[in-house]
Amino acid sequence: LRERCGAEVVWVKHENHTPTGAFKLRGGLIYAERLRRERPYVRGIVSATRGNHGQSLAWAGRRYGIAVTVVVPHGNSTEKNAAMRAFGARVIEHGDDFEMAREEAVRLAASEELEFAPSYAPDLVKGVATYSLELFRAAPLLNALYVPIGLGSGICGAILVRDLLGLSTEIIGVQAAGAAAYARSFEEGRVVALNRAETHADGVAVRQPDAEAFAIIRAGASRIVTVSDDAIAAAIRAYWTDTHNLVEGAGAAPLAALLAERDRMAGKRIGLVVTGGNIDLALFRSWVLREPQAAVS
């Protein structure tokens, strides 16, 4: 992998090996523990998700005895839906994308007297920040760390830990080109929402940035790189070939960005965050195994 990237060293933070297969579990545990401790009378929680956030809440809710409802958009990953149900969550399909699912989750919170659990919140950032702390403590001083951006908890945690440790590491956000709301916002210096988020990498398929997350990203990230779905698929294949790890689209996006900036990062010490490995078999076959066809004149 180091040779492929042309870097002096590449450190990969493998969050695909947590009990739920993704980094989100760290935040879910912090959120559920505090809720059970401070508000034990809560009837249950409801949230919107494309999968990993919902799995984290379901797993943590089962551990702390909290009923969990998750709302997913129609067409969501069938395997992530099955995993959430296996962890004990009630799964409801609603709307065409994450934002529509979130609106339904807010409605359910009011109608069923449930606690609405946002996908970006201080407890979630505190929890997921621990993976950055582990990486920065284990790795040599990194010149740059590439982090995918969905709603922003992971990169915000990385920025906060970097600053608390007094490190000079560049934090570089990565988004899919078809769902580049944060990249667009970063360029314009204000929150910019998109009409659609089109990418096979469901973990970064967000069209409405969170204002609090954007403020942290704008102040602490060096830049945001966008990568095509073809580049993400190539990065998934590279991880499998080079490390024998199965990585989902969002988790492979940082490697895709590093490969796109190979010349710029030559000879440097680079960190990559594999945020998860939860990719449907059908999507893996139809997207990742289908290499782009060369143009024919």
Please describe what each predicted stretch is.
Residues 1-297:
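PLP-dependent amino-acid enzyme catalytic core
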